[in-house]
């Protein structure tokens, strides 16, 4: 797998790439803008070009953009729905300009809306975004932790979206903490095998483009989005070892979104790389 971190760019692209390289990243994920606003900022083309060059020099590829948290493609509020689509389209444009392969997005919440109507609204929004997607960029739908009426919590629902849209540049990101919170028992080889088999059946393993590797202290099926340090939660060493060793997943990208500071980033990267190399026992 190409393993890396979500890195912050508030200190500039140079520092972000330096940090990623220092902790052993082969891939990275970033926010292109403030993740907690519907406002989009003007694109700094020179900075994007410099960022791409820095990544090439560091051997870091692919790069993913994570869209803002506020996106809700199922909303009945026209301002929210339209603002969400604008954010998604903006990140797809930035990715194309900056040589970033993936744009990873949450889908939002159905709220009190009929789920069939909400599903149709999500499909329409994604169809609109995909109609303008540039070559070499992939739109990646992330599974939710299953809380409340969040969209995309199950493998079956993600698969239904993939089939409904049937677009070659549409894929899926599977977050391990979210999967566990939804009830997928991925803390053993047997559990991971069942999970991957189910995902292949419903989504197609070729459509699984990314993973978010996060441990969690949430109980199985707890429906809460809480990330924790690799190997220190309920998924544990055995779960991540099984994911890393699975033959169908070896060409995938895995991004850590673990909590903490730069020292925690280094510790989590060292742990996941040691698991990959077989240096950590279960």
Segments predicted by a language model, with ranges:
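N-terminal pre-domain/capping segments
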Residues: 1-67, 71-90, 278-282
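Active-site beta-loop-alpha junctions enriched in small/polar residues
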Residues: 6-10, 31-35, 68-70, 108-110, ...
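Aromatic/hydrophobic pocket-lining residues that form the small-molecule binding cavity
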Residues: 13, 48, 84, 88, ...
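Acidic (Asp/Glu)-rich catalytic clusters
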Residues: 18-25, 44-64, 89-99, 127-136, ...
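Conserved, mostly hydrophobic/aromatic
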Residues: 20, 66, 84, 95, ...
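Active-site acidic/histidine proton-transfer and metal-coordination neighborhood
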Residues: 56-57, 73-171
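Acidic/histidine-rich catalytic cores of soluble enzymes
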Residues: 123-228
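C-terminal helical cap(s) of enzyme catalytic domains, especially alpha/beta-barrels
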Residues: 262-281
């Amino acid at each position: 797998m190409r393993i890396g971190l979500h890195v912050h760019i508030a200190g500039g692209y140079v520092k972000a790439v330096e940090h990623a390289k220092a902790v052993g990243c082969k891939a990275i994920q970033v926010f292109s803008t403030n993740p907690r606003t519907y406002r989009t900022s003007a694109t700094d083309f020179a900075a994007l070009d410099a960022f791409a060059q820095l990544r090439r020099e560091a051997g870091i590829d692919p790069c993913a953009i994570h869209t803002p948290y506020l996106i809700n493609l199922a909303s009945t509020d026209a301002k929210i729905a339209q603002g969400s689509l604008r954010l998604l389209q903006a990140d797809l444009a930035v990715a194309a300009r900056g040589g970033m392969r993936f744009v990873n997005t949450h889908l939002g919440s159905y709220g009190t809306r009929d789920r069939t109507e909400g599903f149709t609204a999500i499909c329409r929004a994604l169809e609109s975004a995909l109609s303008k997607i540039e070559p070499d960029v992939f739109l990646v739908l992330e599974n939710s932790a299953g809380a409340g009426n969040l969209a995309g919590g199950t493998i079956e629902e993600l698969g239904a979206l993939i089939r409904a849209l049937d677009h070659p540049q549409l894929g899926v990101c599977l977050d391990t903490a979210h999967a566990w919170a939804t009830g997928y028992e991925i803390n053993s080889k047997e559990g991971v095998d069942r999970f991957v088999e189910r995902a292949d059946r419903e989504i197609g393993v070729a459509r699984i483009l990314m993973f978010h590797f996060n441990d969690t202290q949430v109980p199985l099926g707890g429906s809460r989005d809480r990330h924790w340090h690799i190997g220190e939660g309920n998924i544990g060493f055995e779960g991540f070892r099984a994911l890393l060793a699975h033959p169908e997943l070896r060409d995938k990208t895995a991004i850590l979104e673990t909590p903490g500071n730069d020292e925690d980033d280094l510790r989590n990267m060292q742990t996941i790389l040691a698991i990959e190399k077989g240096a950590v026992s279960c």
